[in-house]
Amino acid sequence: MKYIDRKGNITIEENGQDKLLKHLYNDRGGRLCLKLLVRPFVSKAAGLFLNTGISAKLVPGFVKRNRIDLSLYQKQEFTSYNDFFTRKIKPQERPVAEEDKVLISPCDGKAIVCRIADDSRFYIKDTEYTVEQLLRNKKLARKYLGGYALILRLTVDDYHRYCYVADGEKSKNVVLPGVFHTVNPAANDALPIYKENAREYTLLKTEKFGTILMMEVGAMMVGKITNHKKGSGPVKKGEEKGYFEFGGSTVIMLLQHGKVRLDYDLIENSENDYETIVRMGERIGEQKLSKRTGKNHRREPEAQ
């Protein structure tokens, strides 16, 4: 994978999770393992184990392998693996860009920006989507034509809590249950497993950025999504929205046409096939003012 941080430093690497997923999705042996792993009883058993005290013994090795600095977090001792995985960071380590016109990142992760068109296809964990397939809602998908999809991929070493990106009024959460597909040996290929994973979204109506769709996608096995507020109501920029339990996961934002000017580096990096490393609370864009104001009207490049 090719990553670039906001200062322009490039990293080319493949972590253990990337290697495992490539094996599971792209060769016959891996797909046979995948057929077993996605069975409900296996996923349930794994989830139960990760909440036990015994699972806490896995934490020290994980911390060492992934070079995680526990001093950044509110506690350093954990009762289970999931207690560790959902650990809270110290607030000062993720300051929120406070200007009203500034849009912030909802989470830590590796970001890709894509323009949304009728023929747009987005890749998440080697699976191809249209916006309509992602939302299972044709009418809602059309609301974001011409805008941006911001896909933030979390790996196991990332902070797995996420926040609201602006002040606004949220809708009720929409839950799309997951459907696990198995392999197709005759075609020697895997059916699109990841896009059928459980996912959840809410619409955030804002004064400055239009209506932002915020979606969370669970991981392949036990990546449970926990959102704190299920119903509609007001929320604040930087307020914690929820968290993922164990598993690399994905946060997706859909932005309406003409409402947000994303930062140039995010778009340019995406055009050059780099994922941009971002942190929760940091600036990723700003309100796009209309032509009538005579401000902030620099032409935006197209993302692929």
Predicted regions and their residues:
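Contiguous, well-folded functional domains in the mature portion of proteins
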Residues: 1-304
